[in-house]
Amino acid sequence: MTVLTEKELSTLKDLLSSEELLVKKFKMLAEQAEKPELKNQLESIAKKHQGHFNELYSKLS
């Protein structure tokens, strides 16, 4: 396992926060969308950012 520096951990924390916020925003927008195609696109974007979050989180273990 690679040991991360304090700077790397700080950057990772910032990226995790950003991705988490994007997931929440796109899920909220998807819930409010009336057009099915827009709703699907927004849900897809939320899933993409959730994947980014999961990938970054996996770097912590």
Where are each of the predicted segments found?
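His/Met- and acidic-residue-enriched segments that coordinate or traffic transition-metal cofactors
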Residues: 1-61
